[in-house]
């Protein structure tokens, strides 16, 4: 099968690209044809199996908020693939990830908020946002934005809805609390994923040596200085 990896690397986040692609080549869905689609404002050289899509250089948090808008812009290209998976560029793969992640719509449980009572999870509570989740409408699970995907058809159906919602929010001077993650969680309450991966697939690096954490790491969110990277 043909698998496309979606990644965004703006500003200083470009430093993580090479490591992530090396990890994917070594440990992600081996045995399938893997290609990449990198969204960046940088002028970069890549291997033949990586396509670069140029985006505007915008301040944080526009590059993450508008990720689904970027995907929709490349819909014709993305639609050539059987499955597509989005990785935050500052992720690492520490254990082999195989066909267990193949499903129509795949989301990953948040490495922290999954353990909170659902009424304490930080859904968007602003009624002016299309990501709004009223008290009492919380989902059974809360999902992280760092790794998700699925069949191209189902994933792009979600992307088109969320791109439209983000655009409408921006037209009303509204930004969802956790940007794309808030928008995605609202969508997944109404359209549950066909596969909910455990926090093993979006594992906080600072938990690597915590013997009491109930999951083992497969894909990790690297510990970093967010303020420095976004400056």
Sequence positions of predicted segments:
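PAPS-dependent sulfotransferase catalytic domain
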Residues: 100-157, 161-162, 181
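N-terminal anchoring/stem segment of glycosyltransferases
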Residues: 1-66, 73-80, 224
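GT-A fold catalytic core of metal-dependent nucleotide-sugar glycosyltransferases
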Residues: 68-118
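Conserved glycosyltransferase catalytic-site signature
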Residues: 64, 68, 89-91, 177-182
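Active-site regions of enzymes building and remodeling cell-envelope glycoconjugates
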Residues: 47-58, 101-109, 212-220
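Catalytic core and acceptor-binding pocket of nucleotide-sugar-dependent glycosyltransferases
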Residues: 137-225
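Short, polar loop motifs at secondary-structure junctions
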Residues: 36-45, 89-97, 201-202
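A structural signal for short, well-ordered beta-strand segments and their strand-loop junctions
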Residues: 37-38, 84-88, 108, 149, ...
């Amino acid at each position: 099968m043909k698998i496309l990896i979606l990644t965004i690397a703006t500003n200083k986040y470009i430093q993580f690209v090479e490591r992530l692609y090396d990890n994917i080549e070594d440990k992600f869905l081996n045995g399938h044809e893997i290609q990449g689609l990198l969204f960046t404002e940088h002028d970069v050289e890549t291997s033949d199996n990586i396509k670069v899509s140029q985006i505007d250089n915008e301040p944080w948090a526009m590059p993450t908020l508008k990720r689904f808008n970027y995907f929709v812009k490349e819909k014709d290209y993305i639609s050539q693939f059987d499955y597509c998976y989005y990785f935050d560029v500052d992720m690492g793969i520490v254990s082999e990830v195989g066909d267990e992640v193949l499903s129509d719509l795949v989301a990953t449980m948040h490495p922290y908020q999954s353990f909170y009572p659902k009424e304490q999870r930080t859904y968007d509570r602003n009624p002016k946002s299309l990501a709004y989740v009223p008290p009492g409408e919380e989902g059974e699970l809360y999902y992280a934005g760092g790794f998700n995907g699925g069949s191209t058809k189902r994933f792009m159906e979600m992307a088109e809805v969320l791109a439209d919602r983000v655009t409408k929010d921006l037209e009303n001077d509204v930004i969802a609390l956790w940007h794309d993650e808030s928008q995605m969680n609202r969508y997944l309450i109404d359209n549950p994923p066909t596969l909910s991966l455990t926090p093993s697939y979006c594992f906080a690096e600072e938990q690597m040596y915590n013997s009491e954490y109930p999951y083992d790491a497969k894909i990790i969110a690297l510990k970093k200085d967010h303020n420095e990277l976004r400056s």
